[in-house]
C-alpha cells in the first residue's frame, strides 16, 4: 500500500502550541505490515528534515525508500510482526498540510500565512492519525535527526501509549552551531529575489539550492569529502575567469542543490528548520522540571562521533542528563565517515542494525 491520506481535525481544529488553530489537516502516510487484533504492535517511524513517508518499497518495482534495509519480513522492523506507520510531517510538502497547501479560507496557498509550529505540534498530528487508524499502543517510536526529536517528544507527551523510544543522532536541544547553519540556509532562501516574500511561483531555486548545499556540508564529513573528491576537477565551460577550474566537490554540491529544488518547498524548509531550532526538552515545563524528566520508558540513544550537525558532545551531554534523572536510557556511539547521515547509508547498516534489533528484542514482553 503506497501513500495514503486522511483528513483530521475536521470537527475540532488542531490547537497548536502557540495558541493558533487549523482545520482540517490532511496527513500523508504509508503503512507496512498488519495491525494486530489487539492493536498494539505498531511502530511509528519518524523521518528527518527533508524525508517523506516512503520509508521502504512496498513491492519489487516500487521506488526505493529511505530505510529499505531495515524494513520488511525478517528485517529489523519485521513487517510480519509489526505494523509500521510512517507519516509525512505536519508543515512538510509531501502529502501533509503545510505552507504550500490551499488555505480553505482564501482558496490560495497558505505560504507564509501558515501558522508557526513546533515538534510537539508535529507529533500531535501523528497521535490523531494513529487514533484514527485504531492503534492503541506503540511498541516503539523510531527516528533519526529531526525524527529523533519527534521520538523524544512522544516519550514526554504520549508515554501512556508508547513503550519505547529509539533516537538516532538527535540531541535533547538544538545546539548553537546547528541553529547557525539553519539561519544561513534560511537567509539564502529569504534573500533570493524569486522568493518574493514567500509568494513565489515555482521555487526560489537559487536560494533553496544554496540552502541544500550548506546542509550537505553538515550531513557528511571532511574525511569522506577528501577521500571521494580530493582536489579533482571536472570539465566545465564557463565564461567567468574565476570559475575556469571546476572542482568535483562543486559539481557534487550543485547537483544536490539542483535536484533538491525539484522535490521540496522553500517555505516548508523555513518552517521546519525553525521548528528544529526551537526544540529544547531540557527547558523547564510547567512544573519547573526539565521536560525530559517525564521520560520513564526504555530509551535508546545512538550518537555519531563524526556528526557535523548535531555534535557528539551534545549527545553525550543528553545521555548524562537522562541518566541523572533516572531515565532508563541505553547509549551507544557509532563512528562513520558518513557523519550525520550515516544512519541513512546502506554501507553503514551493520553498525546500526544490531543496536536497534537488540533493543527491540529485549523490550518487556508487554511491548512485543
Swiss-Prot record:
GO molecular function, one term: homoserine O-acetyltransferase activity
Primary localization: cytoplasm
Entry's EC annotation: 2.3.1.31
Pathway the protein takes part in: Amino-acid biosynthesis; L-methionine biosynthesis via de novo pathway; O-acetyl-L-homoserine from L-homoserine: step 1/1
Transmembrane segments: none
The entry's keywords: Acyltransferase, Amino-acid biosynthesis, Cytoplasm, Methionine biosynthesis, Transferase
Presence of the UniProt keyword Transmembrane in the record: no
Matches recorded under Gene3D superfamilies: 1.10.1740.110, alpha/beta hydrolase
Catalytic activity: L-homoserine + acetyl-CoA = O-acetyl-L-homoserine + CoA
Biological process (GO), any one: homoserine metabolic process
Family matches, as InterPro entries: AB_hydrolase_1, AB_hydrolase_fold, HAT_MetX-like
Family recorded in the similarity comment: Belongs to the AB hydrolase superfamily. MetX family.
Function: Transfers an acetyl group from acetyl-CoA to L-homoserine, forming acetyl-L-homoserine.
Protein name in the entry: Homoserine O-acetyltransferase
